[in-house]
Amino acid sequence: MVLATACSDRMTSSDDRWGRGGELIAMSGGEGGARYACVTCHGPRGEGNGFDAPRLAGLPAGYLQKQMEDYAAGLRAHEVMRDAARFLDSHERVRVANHYAALPPQALSPATEEAIAAATPGLYASACQQCHGVEGVGTVNGPPLNAQPAFYLTQQLQDWQVSKRRNDGNHVMLKMAQQLKPAEVRQLSLYLARIPPRPVPLDR
């Protein structure tokens, strides 16, 4: 009887570990199923799709968790992400965030000539560097932006400009984005997209 109980306990622990681990949740979508699986849009290694689904690999776990919480609470607008986040409980969101934070960051594709030609380090330094770090590597105050798809970065900046996105707490991003001209938004997006990704500490 004791042996049977111990065996049962081990199986339960193993089932929970494999059934609710961050990678398994990202692959399966949890209660939401394949339609809401992270890998459907963000790729099997969190590399993004080069368009409207950003790179997740190597981003700080705390940042990733906060974005899922904000989507679930309706503080950040995106219909699919809202539903995907709501299908996960708070513990599952933590596991998914830790999974992607532990993956090695990688660029989806090499920099284009257009991106290199549009590089504007001076504009980035004055508008973004204080919070997002040199070459967009991220700081404790802002997530990494380097190697994210230019389309995605442009979309996010435009969302900040019209207050569609406003989940930064103190609204620094809201105010900064609204100061940018359309051409500057594009230049910044292309500049950041060309910078190779770099690992960041897992506890950031």
Q: Model-derived features: where do they sit?
A:
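C-terminal motif of bacterial Sec signal peptides marking the signal peptidase cleavage site
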Residues: 4-6
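Bacterial signal peptide processing site
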Residues: 8-11
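Sequence/structural segment immediately N-terminal to covalent heme-attachment motifs in c-type
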Residues: 14-44, 112-137, 149
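Extracytoplasmic c-type cytochrome modules immediately beyond a signal peptide or single-pass transmembrane anchor
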Residues: 24, 53, 61-102, 108-112
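His/Met- and acidic-residue-enriched segments that coordinate or traffic transition-metal cofactors
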Residues: 30, 36-37, 70, 116-118, ...
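Gly/Gly-Pro-rich "capping" loops immediately C-terminal to redox-active cysteine motifs
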Residues: 39-73, 82-87, 121, 136-162, ...
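Inter-heme linker and motif-flanking segments adjacent to c-type heme-binding CXXCH motifs
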Residues: 47-48, 74-77, 102-116, 129-130, ...
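C-terminal capping alpha-helices of c-type cytochrome domains
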Residues: 86-108, 178-204
